């Protein structure tokens, strides 16, 4: 398996259309069993890997993540010496926005993914990367899902957007879902937002990766464009490269406002208009959005 940065590969596990054809058996990881009380029996090696992952990333995000994410981290109060248990996370999410996390296998289908979001349940694969894949991983693991995404689910506007997104996706056709996937990619996974005159990060695909966090916030290579829903829906992406473009919200309330619009009408218009020219070189057997 090629060594591609974690943050640009997570789409294989959730939102890449190509993944719909892949068997769960193709992943080398298997989610750990969850008890009737929602507890997972993590071992000491896994606790040690979690400690190294979270302590490293805490330093990277503290000046680069948006305030809503940092506030959410404070609410979650994730332990650094051990992996958190699902009920600990659910108590906070339920209190703040009515969400919960739902344990799932390493790879799930589009149908399952959208159904969970529509029910205010965020899918969390109950496995953690091995030490030899500390920085490179194909599937979205427990660290990516919990550290990358759960903090933002404490924010009402983000939570409302994600809920409506799930409802729309649950009813969408496969082609419509491919356009919706681009919306998710450039918001929930790789979204940026303006905050007091600075560009900050709220996308979990960025915030769970030190390399992508630095690249998205400081590199002069990628474009950073004002968020435009029609542009977003028509922008191709690849999961095996650092992103050539990010879309920047003026503020997080725009996510809620977007959730109140007729998003599917915008999807249909984007389908009629077609995709924009890609900002990356073609690749044989590429996995593109």
UniProtKB/Swiss-Prot annotation:
Coiled coil (UniProt feature): none
Catalytic class of the enzyme: oxidoreductase
Keyword Oxidoreductase on entry: yes
Protein name: Phenylalanine-4-hydroxylase
Catalytic activity: (6R)-L-erythro-5,6,7,8-tetrahydrobiopterin + L-phenylalanine + O2 = (4aS,6R)-4a-hydroxy-L-erythro-5,6,7,8-tetrahydrobiopterin + L-tyrosine
A GO BP entry: L-phenylalanine catabolic process
Classification via Pfam families: Biopterin_H
Alphabetical keyword list: Iron, Metal-binding, Monooxygenase, Oxidoreductase, Phenylalanine catabolism
Cofactor annotation: Fe(2+)
Listed EC numbers: 1.14.16.1
Gene: phhA
GO molecular function terms attached to this record: iron ion binding; phenylalanine 4-monooxygenase activity
């Amino acid at each position: 398996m090629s060594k591609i940065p974690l943050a640009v590969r997570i789409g294989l596990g959730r939102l890449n259309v190509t993944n719909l054809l892949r068997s769960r058996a193709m992943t080398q990881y298997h989610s750990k069993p969850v008890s009737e009380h929602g507890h997972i029996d993590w071992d000491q090696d896994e606790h040690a890997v979690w400690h190294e992952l979270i302590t490293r990333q805490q330093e990277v995000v503290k000046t680069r993540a948006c305030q809503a994410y940092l506030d959410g981290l404070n609410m979650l109060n994730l332990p650094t010496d051990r992996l958190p248990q699902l009920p600990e996370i659910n108590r906070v999410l339920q209190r703040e926005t009515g969400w919960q996390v739902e344990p799932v296998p390493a790879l799930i289908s589009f149908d399952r993914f959208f159904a969970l979001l529509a029910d205010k349940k965020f899918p969390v694969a109950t496995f953690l990367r091995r030490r030899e894949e500390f920085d490179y991983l194909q599937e979205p693991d427990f660290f990516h899902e919990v550290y990358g995404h759960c903090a933002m689910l404490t924010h009402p506007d983000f939570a409302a957007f994600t809920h409506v997104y799930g409802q729309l996706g649950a009813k969408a056709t496969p082609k419509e879902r491919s356009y919706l996937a681009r919306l998710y990619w450039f918001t929930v996974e790789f979204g940026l937002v303006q905050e007091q005159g600075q560009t900050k990060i709220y996308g979990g695909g960025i915030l769970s990766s030190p390399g992508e966090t630095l690249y998205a916030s400081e590199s002069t290579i990628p474009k950073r464009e004002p968020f435009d829903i029609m542009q977003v829906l028509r922008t191709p992406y690849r999961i095996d490269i650092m992103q050539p473009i990010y879309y920047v919200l003026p503020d997080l309330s725009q996510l809620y406002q977007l959730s109140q619009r007729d998003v599917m009408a915008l999807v249909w218009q984007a389908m009629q208009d077609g995709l924009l020219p890609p900002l990356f070189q073609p690749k044989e057997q590429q996995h593109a959005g």
